[in-house]
A protein has these predicted regions:
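Short stretches within intrinsically disordered, low-complexity N-terminal or propeptide regions
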Residues: 7-9, 160, 683, 687
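Beta-rich interaction/scaffold domains
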Residues: 605-706
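C-terminal segment of classical bacterial N-terminal signal peptides
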Residues: 9-15
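N-terminal cationic leader/targeting segments used for protein routing and processing
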Residues: 15, 20-21, 676
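Carbohydrate-active catalytic/glycan-binding domains of CAZyme proteins
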Residues: 20-607
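Sec-dependent N-terminal signal peptides
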Residues: 1-6
Length: 706
């Protein structure tokens, strides 16, 4: 370890990294890439909270001929409300979907009164336009969904998918100009025109806009403005029937739905919000947040995405059903009915084809917290035919399993209830299972059940620490924590954006590791490690592959690593397999905190990544830095969780000089000292993640007074 010395930092170095990205000062090659340690689902770092993600694939502006997957979302950085001041974009090369790069806060808006607008769910589209010389040029229209007064319909334009973007339709009062039509949760679809006989052939495209909260509207947009209704056309309102719960239509009695296919039941659509449209073959598929659950035997929730399909971008539509229920639908213990294994709040997303694989993107709320939502993804299989919808053609979205004979996953109970949407897993883009020989935080678990089959509402905790890719899970007696799935069979060659990895062969002699901190001092604790299912029966075929026994007299509040030999059960196994941890105890109530788990082989010892710490003194006296950052609000406009602040009062005779030590060779820091006897000292600390070129910087402000 290298002991680093203190140094002065110039004021220009205190510009936040996020601000530099937005202003174009940080090159793409210098941006943070999430490539440290085990990665799963959520597919972005566990400290990052990007809900409402709209997935797109665009050509990489820095590598012509290569393509990147982009996720364009809002940003939960306020901690006490939805979203924040920026539209956030992350992207990854389509050939490696585990290398997500933070492209930064691509757009913010500060009003004339100095306050920052909050940005809700956005959309971004690419259009080919002519430049001044008549040559084709790619331009990008951002629909940021500002919540600022009279700015909901704001539209912005840029030359790159990662910005910067400039508003197009604001007047001198910073309000959207007359005719701007885009509303809540905007979605825009670009229909490319290749037919020379089409009246829009010269323009090359038609544009359609969709919006609405508990009410659905669609319209053709004016290609000249991209923010107003096309002259000579009228919006379709309502576009889809909206519901107040599953099957209960909320639109006014007598509403005529002109955009539904003949014979469609308005109660089957259940629109809530979050419109998004894609083309699949010769059909158009609308994804939206919609009430679901009773159609497969569960309670009604809007924590699900539904879909419908049509022959044209504005319908007439046929209902397709549920695309994903973020509550994680599974069989109950005896398989007689379905149940949920995860938390509910809301969700938002869409489908996107990347290479030859379709995915559905959505978000989850840790323990149901809607202010720290996380980006999730699942593979899907889409089946469609060439027959027009008007003649009986269909689109069907299935859960996807690469190891199933028909590549279809579904959960079907013996009572006949069947959930056919995407499976909620720990995998992310690791669709062949998580590479087993890595540490996986509790944040990558996808099953959180208590002994009664519900969810422990105090389980998965939020994380705002950009140096620490970890979430901790509080555990009660009887809780079940599950990971679906580990790729124990390995992957022999790169496939579908996943790099090849080793499985648990007999040469490895594999062990399994669990990190757990006991917080209760009463009784012993047993952690059963189950494979394939949490229960031993003919429905789940769960198999106990190990047991961890924690004695009643074991230390409290002491994080321990427990290792068991599981080679007998996992070595030379094929495919992917779920691992469940079942926490048993003689007493009810809280047991402790589960940190994470993973496999290791006989030649290596699995280590849990630990973030760096700074040892700070003022006038020779050690102080404790704040653990939680200053969160964003309308006044500070923070777009990240890098700002920390504290007050410190000097003791008599104590000098205000700040000194910093850190026993980490990959850490650099600078200190702006107080000018005089009191004032604000600033510590800027830059952490280089081991084995990578990715850095994250924190700024600590210490307000020193006598």
């Amino acid at each position: 370890m290298l002991l680093l010395a203190c140094a002065l930092v110039l004021s220009t170095q205190n510009i936040s990294a996020a601000k530099k990205v937005q202003e174009g000062q940080v090159k793409a090659s210098q941006r943070f890439v999430h490539n440290y340690g085990g990665r799963g689902n959520p597919y972005l770092p566990l400290w990052e909270h990007v809900p409402d993600g709209e997935p797109k694939v665009f050509e990489d502006p820095d590598r012509p001929g290569h393509y990147r997957a982009y996720i364009i979302g809002s940003h939960d950085v306020s901690a006490n409300r939805y979203c924040g001041p920026d539209i956030r974009i992350w992207s990854a090369p389509i050939e490696n979907l585990n290398e997500w790069r933070d492209d930064g806060p691509v757009f913010t808006f500060q009003a004339a009164n100095g306050r920052w607008d909050v940005m809700y769910a956005p959309d971004l589209v690419e259009v080919i336009e002519k430049d001044a010389k008549g040559k084709d040029k790619k331009v990008y229209y951002l629909y940021p969904h500002s919540r600022g007064p009279r700015r909901e319909a704001m539209v912005c334009k840029g030359d790159r998918p990662d910005g910067p973007f400039t508003p197009l339709n604001l007047d001198e009062n910073q309000a959207a100009i007359a005719g701007s039509c885009i509303g809540f949760d905007p979605s825009v679809f670009i229909e490319k025109i290749t037919d020379k006989d089409d009246p829009d052939y010269a323009k090359g495209f038609r544009a359609y806009g969709y919006w609405g909260f508990q009410h659905s509207t669609g319209a053709q947009l004016d290609q000249e403005t991209m923010y107003s209704v096309r002259p000579g056309t009228t919006p379709v309102d309502p576009l889809l029937p909206a519901s107040s719960s599953y099957g209960r239509v909320r639109d006014r009695q007598g509403t005529v739905y002109t955009a539904l296919a003949e014979g469609q039941d308005p109660g089957q659509f259940n629109f809530f919000e979050a419109s998004s449209i894609r083309q699949v073959g010769n059909k158009y598929v609308m994804i939206f947040s919609g009430y679901s659950g009773p159609d497969y035997g569960l309670g009604s929730t809007n924590s699900a995405l539904r879909y419908c399909y049509a022959d044209s971008p504005l319908g007439p539509w046929k209902s397709g059903g549920v695309a994903v229920d973020s509550r994680g639908v599974i069989l109950n213990e005896d398989g007689t009915k379905l149940m949920t294994s995860n938390f509910a709040h809301n969700t938002h997303g869409s489908i996107q084809q990347i290479g030859d694989q379709w995915y559905i993107f959505y978000h989850r709320p840790p323990r149901g917290n809607g202010n720290a939502r996380q980006a999730m993804v699942a593979p899907i299989k889409i089946e469609w035919d060439e027959k027009p919808v008007s003649e009986g053609g269909t689109v069907k979205i299935h859960g996807y399993d690469p190891y199933a004979p028909d590549e279809i996953w579904e959960a079907k109970a013996s009572n006949g209830d069947c959930y056919s949407g995407a499976e909620v897993t720990s995998e992310g883009f690791n669709i062949y299972g998580l590479p087993p020989y890595a540490y996986y935080s509790a944040g990558y678990a996808c099953v959180f059940m208590n002994k009664n089959g519900g969810q422990n509402r105090n389980s998965l905790q939020d994380n705002w620490d950009i140096w620490n890719n970890e979430q901790i899970c509080n555990v009660d007696a009887g809780d079940i924590i599950g990971y679906k799935y580990f790729g124990l069979g390995g992957l022999k060659k790169d496939s579908k954006g996943v790099e090849a990895f080793d499985g648990t062969t007999s040469k490895q002699h594999s062990s399994f590791n669990v990190w757990f901190k006991r917080t209760s001092g009463e009784g012993g604790i047993t952690i059963k490690v189950m494979m394939d299912g949490p229960w031993k029966n003919d429905v789940w075929n769960g198999k106990e592959i190990g047991k961890i026994k924690i004695p009643a007299n074991s230390p409290v509040n002491d994080l321990q690593k427990y290792t068991i030999d599981v080679s007998e059960f996992v070595d030379d196994i094929e495919g992917k397999h779920a691992i469940y941890l079942v926490f048993d105890a003689a007493v009810d109530g809280a047991l402790g905190q589960f940190y994470g788990c993973g496999f290791n082989n006989k030649t290596t010892s699995l280590k849990r990544p630990v973030p760096p710490t700074l040892n700070v003194k003022i006038g020779g006296k050690e102080i404790e830095l704040p653990a939680e950052p200053v969160h964003s609000n309308d006044n500070n406009g923070y777009t990240d969780n890098t700002h920390y602040e504290m007050d410190y009062k000097l003791e008599p005779g104590q000098k205000p000089r700040v000194s910093v030590e850190c026993l980490w060779s990959t850490m650099q820091f600078w200190v702006d000292q107080v000018k005089g006897d009191e004032g604000t000292a600033v510590i800027t600390a830059e952490y280089l993640f081991p084995g990578t070129t990715s850095k994250q910087t924190k700024v600590y402000k210490i307000n020193i007074s006598k």
